[in-house]
Amino acid sequence: MDHAESAVNKEGSSLKISGSLPVIPTPFRDNRIDFDSLLRLFDHIFPELEGYTLCGSTGEAPSLTMDERIELMKFATRNTPPSKTIVVGLTHTNLEEMTRLACTAEELGIHAGLVPCPYYFPNTFPMVLEFFRALDRASGLELVLYDNPVYTKTWLTADQLLAMVDACQH
């Protein structure tokens, strides 16, 4: 998510994302999240970056349990200066679990959720639009589209992206 200009800039949306917010890896030791190493990574990146993205593909999100993802979000919010932006990947094949992640992220004060189009099954644009509307209605978390058509098998046009912006409040 490097050099993003902004999340949805709509009335009621005050989030402004700027700068470099790379997806950071999730370190492991003995098959468990290595929070000491993650804290050292934070100490290394905070002077250089405006924030970071947690639980993206590079952050091993598809391999993490829901409890591990939530534990990571809690750790991140406790150990990140308020001046830094935190975006969290909400990738999941189940809308209910994505909603749970989004609501938890919002409660913890995370700034935005990185959301891919539904994946695994082929999508039509109306399906994608309703998916984003449902996630948007369920949470007040700002949503950032993770456009990865190779893996989601969903290619979006500029007009479709604009329709998504119009359809969502966050």
Task: Please place each PLM-identified region on the residue numbering.
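Basic phosphate/pyrophosphate-binding loop/patch that engages nucleotide-derived ligands
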Residues: 166-170
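Active-site beta->alpha loop and helix N-cap motifs at the rims of alpha/beta catalytic domains
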Residues: 2, 8-155, 161-163
